[in-house]
Amino acid sequence: VVFIFGPAGAGKTYIKDVLGLPNNFIVINTDELVEDVFPRYGLSLNFEEGPQVVKQELRKLLQQATAERMRKYVNKCMPLLIDTPGEKINKIRDIVRALVEIGYDVALFQINVPPDYSVQSDEERWAKKGERKVGPKLTRQIANQYQKNVVRDAVYLQLGEERGVTLLSDKIYPNIFDINTGEIREDFDESVLQDDKLELKDP
């Protein structure tokens, strides 16, 4: 099982291609169901547009369906690629431990981009491709929570110390957002972000 951690608009889809996983890996991602189901019910993929209550309830059902789908494939010992923003870190830790316990090898990959980059990517994804738009407020909330979990509390590195877990990116790459000030660090080299994608260079 491979987990890819990253906030909305961080480039997780791009990283999936970079990792070059075999085609038999099954992607577990609620947002893919959202993009398939919402239009069937006449619901906009722009999460800022109403009806909010209907969208929230439908998304909860899709999250449950995704969890059930994952259980089904785990029972069949299928290889999985789990795409997650990583904000519910305790739940992720429980899932990782459960997978290792039943015999899975687990690998983790984390992406760290500044919240402003996440917001920009989310906006461009909607404007250029018509794909889902989370919106700047929620995107920033998710990005800030991700920074707290992954960067400040070093949960990603802690997970890497668990039995049966391998880190595919073994450094916090790079710590470009200062969670204390809410600003991009002055020493951040913006050249690591090119062509609206995250280029994985050595810090």
Task: List the model feature ranges, each with a label.
Residues 7-8:
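The conserved Walker
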Residues 117-203:
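Conserved GTP-binding G-domain of TRAFAC-class P-loop NTPases and closely related GTPase folds
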Residues 13-76, 90:
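Conserved substrate/cofactor phosphate-moiety recognition/catalytic segment
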Residues 44-47, 99, 125-128:
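Short, hinge-like loop/turn segments at secondary-structure boundaries
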Residues 82-92, 115:
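Acidic, metal-coordinating catalytic cores used for nucleic-acid/nucleotide bond scission
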Residues 76-81, 105:
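Loop/turn-to-beta-strand initiation segments
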Residues 2-3:
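Short hydrophobic/aromatic beta-strand immediately N-terminal to the Walker A/P-loop
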Residues 100-122:
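Conserved phosphate-donor/acceptor-positioning beta-strand/loop module used by diverse small-molecule
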